[in-house]
Amino acid sequence: MKSITVICFLALCTVAITSAYPQEPVLADEARPFANSLFDELPEETYQAAVENFRLKRATCDLLSGFGVGDSACAAHCIARGNRGGYCNSQKVCVCRN
């Protein structure tokens, strides 16, 4: 049983190392056609409204609550955004302080 576990662990490590191996760098000019988004297609007024109302979905509190680090991860996320910290509210949504 131990040998099967070791073999599976080594196979997992091999897959992780080979998938992390760097590929050829992609030039910005080559990547631009693939990076088109909805924001590129909008008129200027609609673009401004979309940027103002754009909200990233937060999964920090909900996913990490099982490990007991939900509030800490939320606070670290908010500090990285330039706020003073944050907390998870009762609905498992990260709320950043100003």
Curated annotation (Swiss-Prot):
GO annotation (BP), single: humoral immune response
Domain of life: Eukaryota
Upregulating conditions: By bacterial infection.
Keywords on record: Antibiotic, Antimicrobial, Defensin, Disulfide bond, Immunity, Innate immunity, Secreted, Signal
Any GO CC annotation of this UniProt entry: extracellular space
Annotated family: Belongs to the invertebrate defensin family. Type 1 subfamily.
Protein task: Antibacterial peptide mostly active against Gram-positive bacteria.
PANTHER family with a match to the protein in the record: DEFENSIN
Protein name (record): Defensin-B
Gene symbol of the encoding locus: DEFB
